[in-house]
UniProtKB/Swiss-Prot annotation:
Residues 168-200 are annotated as: Disordered. Keywords: Hydrolase. InterPro entries: Nudix_hydrolase, NUDIX_hydrolase-like_dom_sf, NUDIX_hydrolase_CS, NUDIX_hydrolase_dom, RppH. It is an enzyme of class 3 (hydrolase). A motif (Nudix box) lies at residues 38-59. The keyword Hydrolase applies. This is RNA pyrophosphohydrolase. Belongs to the Nudix hydrolase family. RppH subfamily.
Length: 231
C-alpha cells in the first residue's frame, strides 16, 4: 500500500528498558541488527500496526510494554533506484514511518523470537541509547537519527553516557557472549567462535525472503546488502 507520493506507510519501534538501553534484533543468519518495524496494513492505525509488529517480531504483548511517546509526524526516507525492484520503479519511492518509543514493562524472558512461523531475528541485545550509526545503510541513517533524537525528550534521564558492553540473547531467552560489538559491526576473530544459543531459530530460505518485501526493514548490515528485496 503506497500513498500518492509513492511512500509505504510503516511503523518503527524503539524499545527501551529501565536503564534506557535500546533493543536491537539480529537478522536470521546475518551479522546485521535492526529495530523492529513493519508496514501498516489497510485499515490499521499506526498504534495497531505497532502492537502487531511487536508481537510478530519479538513476541511481546501490549501488557509487556508501555507507550512513552511517538513521533509527531511521518519521517520519510527515499530508496535509491538500485535498491528497488525493477517492476515497481517509478511508483515506489521509499517509506514514511511513525516511530514509537516503548518502555519494557515485562521481563527479558518475555521476548519470544519465534512467535510466528517466519521469524525475523535469531538473537537480540540491549545497547546504550546513543550508538554510532555508521553501520546503518546510508539512506536510512537520517531517519534513525531523527527518530532517536525526537524521542529522546521522553527519557527520564540523560542517556548520553559512554558506550558500554551489552549482552547478546539467543532464541527466546538466555545469555550469550558479552562483548562491546556495536549493532551491525562484524565480529572480531575472537568473537567468531560459534555461539551456543538456548533456542535455535530455523534459518529462512533466501528464496522465500526475496519476495516478501520491497526492501529491507531497518536493516543494519555490516556492509550494504547486495540484494535490496530481502525481507
Amino acid at each position: 500500500m503506497l500513498d500518492r507520493e509513492g511512500f509505504r506507510p510503516n511503523v518503527g519501534i524503539i524499545l527501551i528498558n529501565a536503564r534506557n538501553e535500546v533493543f536491537w534484533g539480529k537478522r536470521i543468519g546475518e551479522h546485521s541488527w535492526q529495530f523492529p518495524q513493519g508496514g501498516i496494513k489497510y485499515g490499521e492505525t499506526p498504534e495497531q500496526a505497532m502492537y502487531r509488529e511487536l508481537h510478530e517480531e519479538i513476541g511481546l504483548l501490549p501488557e509487556h510494554v508501555r507507550i512513552v511517546g511517538r513521533t509527531r509526524d511521518w519521517l520519510r526516507y527515499e530508496v535509491p533506484d538500485k535498491f528497488i525492484r525493477r517492476e515497481i520503479r517509478g511508483h515506489y519511492r521509499g517509506q514514511k514511518q511513525i516511530w514509537f518509543l516503548l518502555r519494557m514493562a515485562g521481563r527479558d524472558c518475555d521476548v519470544h523470537l519465534r512467535a510466528t512461523e517466519h521469524p525475523e531475528f535469531d538473537a537480540w541485545r540491549w545497547s546504550d541509547y546513543w550508538v554510532p550509526l555508521e553501520a546503518v545503510i546510508e539512506f536510512k541513517r537520517d531517519v534513525y537519527q531523527l527518530a532517536l533524537t525526537e524521542l529522546s525528550r521522553f527519557l527520564n534521564r540523560n542517556p548520553r553516557v559512554p558506550l558500554s558492553p551489552y549482552g547478546v540473547h539467543h532464541g527466546r531467552h538466555g545469555s550469550g557472549q558479552r562483548y562491546a560489538q556495536q549493532p551491525g559491526q562484524p565480529p572480531t576473530l575472537a568473537q567468531r567462535r560459534p555461539l551456543q544459543p538456548v533456542t535455535q531459530v530455523a534459518p529462512v530460505a533466501p528464496a522465500a525472503e526475496a519476495v516478501q518485501a520491497v526492501e529491507s526493514d531497518a536493516v543494519l548490515p555490516a556492509t550494504p546488502a547486495p540484494n535490496p528485496t530481502e525481507s
